[in-house]
Design a protein with these regions (language model features):
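Extracellular, beta-strand-rich glycan-interacting domains
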Residues: 49-58, 113-122, 231, 243-275
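Short tryptophan-centered beta-strand motifs in secreted/extracellular beta-sheet-rich domains
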Residues: 116, 180-189, 198
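Glycan-recognition/cleft segments
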Residues: 130-161, 215-218
């Protein structure tokens, strides 16, 4: 009997040791950046599917870019921290981007909102701001933002969702996106209307012609895998276009959010007014 008791105690201790060694060291949930947006409490399964505030102050760059909804750490973060619109942000380098294993359950969304704060100056690059990776499209991205031909108060601005493009060509996006100040960008898609809306600093920007009517109904993002922030696929060593003209983002970025619903105009304005 004593031998059996001794064996059970040893086995229990061994299980505890193995279990503790197999878990990635993470801080308690209280250490993750909190979301100050009162409209959507931050919890797994809620409307806010992915959110990184870039507010970490650790020497571990992965910790500084962790997603606060599901504690989703990037697999790689080559970018430096910088002063953000609220707390800290990231500074793009034009070459590399942050790679996440997924955007949590955002790929199950049938409507969506993509929101971020950006701060940049005039440059000659064709820059990619983010990519939701998918093998279903020739460019291997189910959503991305491309900006080029920048001037202080105008640029060419292209947003793609399931290979349906809203394009402000020939520098027809006439907003001061490159004046060196912080600006809020948001893109909403509503499955009930099939309309994609673009917002700049809390105000809707009319989409060219009928391009905002994507005609998709419910989105199908189920094939989406990695999320790239601050660049396109090639900047995170993921397959996709590798043309030399494709540059990663060079400015500062903060408060990157993915919602599984189309935010209303007032909800987008609230994000802008609250610097979230």
């Amino acid at each position: 009997m004593k031998n059996k008791i001794h064996f059970c105690l040893v086995l229990t201790a061994l299980i505890l040791v193995v279990s503790s060694c197999s878990k990635k060291d993470r801080p308690s949930l209280a250490d993750y950046p909190k979301d100050a947006d009162p409209h959507f409490p931050l919890y797994p399964g809620g409307p806010l599917k992915f959110y990184t505030a870039f507010n970490g102050t650790s020497t571990d760059k992965l910790m500084n870019a962790v997603d606060s909804v599901r504690a989703n750490f990037p697999t790689n973060n080559p970018l430096a921290s910088a002063t953000g619109i609220t707390g800290s942000g990231i500074k793009g380098d034009g070459v590399k981007a942050i790679k996440y294993p997924s955007a949590n359950d955002f790929n199950l969304s049938t409507s969506c909102t993509i929101s971020m704060w950006v701060n940049n100056t005039v440059n000659p690059n064709t820059e990619l701001y983010f990519s939701l990776v998918s093998k279903d499209y020739w460019h291997e991205s189910s959503a991305f933002l491309l900006v080029e031909h920048a001037a202080v108060d105008k640029c060419t601005f292209k947003f793609a969702l399931q290979d349906h493009w809203v394009e402000y060509t020939n520098q027809s996006f006439t907003k001061p996106l490159f004046n060196g100040n912080w600006h809020h960008l948001a893109f909403t898609y509503d499955e009930t209307t099939s309309l994609l809306k673009v917002y700049f600093d809390g105000v809707e920007v009319p989409t060219p012609g009928t391009s905002g009517n994507l005609g998709l109904g419910k989105l199908n993002l189920k094939s989406s895998t990695n999320l790239v922030v601050g660049g396109w696929n090639k900047h995170a060593d993921i397959s996709g276009p590798t043309d030399a003209w494709i540059s990663a983002y060079t400015g500062k970025m903060d408060q990157f959010r993915l919602y599984g619903k189309a935010l209303s105009a007032s909800e987008v304005l609230a994000l802008y007014n609250s610097k979230l």
